[in-house]
């Protein structure tokens, strides 16, 4: 099978459960995405622990002044993160500080979001993409449950697009791939499943079929 395009979000506060899931699925997914709940419930060392079994994307949605951004990005980098997610609405210098501090860690900037009420961000994706391009990001975060937005963003870039909004937020992994996503983020549909391994396998198969048809 070709490399997975599935990124599993572990939005948990139970470190032991998160590690259990990570160890069970780490080799069959592209990456595991962690967010503030897991880090705040334990410590930043969770990044390195999960990095032993999978790439780790730190979904910190960094959105502060450049100095603070740099501290957060350096910490994630030093802990072994493969990727970091940052907001772009804070402006060029703030986003550039994340890119510069991240070193080889890939920076994905948020240019559109998946939740209801995100119009303020989503209506300005062109400006956010311009800021992101100038800052030198590796890729973008764009919603997999808002296919028209995702398609328009895909038309404007060849960079890697990672898409949330799949499963519990109504999006389908196959539709997101066909609309232009390179990587698909799925969280609750997997970590709340009675069998996360089987759930991840099913989504991997759905993605693989969509890639073949695309």
From Swiss-Prot:
- UniProt EC number: 4.1.1.23
Q: How does it assemble?
A: Homodimer.
Supply the alphabetized keyword list.
Decarboxylase, Lyase, Pyrimidine biosynthesis
Q: Name one GO biological process term.
A: 'de novo' pyrimidine nucleobase biosynthetic process
Q: Which residues bind substrate?
A: 11, 33, 59-68, 114, 164-174, 187-188
Provide one Gene Ontology cellular component: cytosol
Query: What protein family is recorded?
Result: Belongs to the OMP decarboxylase family. Type 1 subfamily.
Physiological role: Catalyzes the decarboxylation of orotidine 5'-monophosphate (OMP) to uridine 5'-monophosphate (UMP).
The protein's name: Orotidine 5'-phosphate decarboxylase
Pathway annotation: Pyrimidine metabolism; UMP biosynthesis via de novo pathway; UMP from orotate: step 2/2
Q: Which residues form the active site?
A: 61 (proton donor)
The UniProt catalytic activity note for this protein reads: orotidine 5'-phosphate + H(+) = UMP + CO2
Identify a single GO molecular function assigned to this protein: orotidine-5'-phosphate decarboxylase activity
């Amino acid at each position: 099978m070709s490399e997975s395009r599935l990124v599993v979000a572990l939005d948990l506060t139970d470190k032991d459960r998160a590690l259990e899931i990570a160890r069970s699925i780490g080799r069959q997914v592209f990456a595991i995405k962690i967010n503030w709940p897991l880090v705040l419930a334990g410590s930043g060392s969770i990044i390195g622990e999960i990095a032993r079994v999978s790439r780790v994307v730190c979904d910190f949605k960094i959105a502060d002044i450049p100095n603070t951004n740099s501290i957060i990005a350096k910490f994630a980098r030093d802990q072994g993160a493969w990727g970091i997610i940052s907001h772009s609405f804070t402006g060029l210098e703030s986003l550039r500080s994340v890119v510069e501090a991240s070193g080889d860690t890939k920076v994905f900037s948020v240019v559109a979001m998946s939740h209801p009420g995100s119009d303020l961000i989503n209506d300005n994706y062109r400006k956010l993409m311009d800021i992101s391009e100038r800052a030198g990001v590796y890729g973008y975060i764009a919603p997999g449950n808002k296919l028209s937005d995702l398609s328009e963003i895909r038309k404007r870039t060849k960079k890697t697009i990672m898409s949330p909004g799949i499963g519990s937020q109504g999006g389908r992994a196959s539709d997101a791939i066909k609309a232009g996503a390179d990587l698909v983020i799925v969280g609750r549909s997997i970590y709340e499943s009675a069998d996360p391994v089987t759930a991840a396998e099913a989504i991997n198969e759905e993605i693989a079929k969509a890639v073949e048809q695309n």
